[in-house]
C-alpha cells in the first residue's frame, strides 16, 4: 500500500488557492516523491517530483522571494 505523509498546507492570500505538500512512499520501495496538490475552487493540479527537482525548485522560489521588496 502506498504511504502518503502530509507535510504542509498553505493558502495563497491573493487568489485563495490551497497548496498541499505530501511525501509519497510506494510499496515497492525506492525513491520518495513530493506530491504537490494545488486546488483552485473545484479544479486540482497534482504532480509528483523527485528530491533533486524539489531542491532546484525550492532554491528558485527562495531566490525569487529574497529578491522582492518587503511588503
What are the functions of these language-model segments?
Residues 1-71:
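Positively charged, low-complexity terminal tracts
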Amino acid at each position: 500500500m502506498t504511504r502518503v505523509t502530509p507535510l504542509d498546507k498553505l493558502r495563497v492570500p491573493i487568489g485563495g488557492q490551497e497548496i498541499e505538500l505530501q511525501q509519497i512512499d510506494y510499496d515497492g520501495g525506492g525513491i520518495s516523491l513530493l506530491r504537490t496538490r494545488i486546488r483552485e475552487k473545484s479544479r486540482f493540479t497534482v504532480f509528483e517530483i523527485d528530491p533533486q527537482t524539489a531542491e532546484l525548485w525550492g532554491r528558485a522560489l527562495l531566490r525569487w522571494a529574497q529578491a522582492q521588496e518587503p511588503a
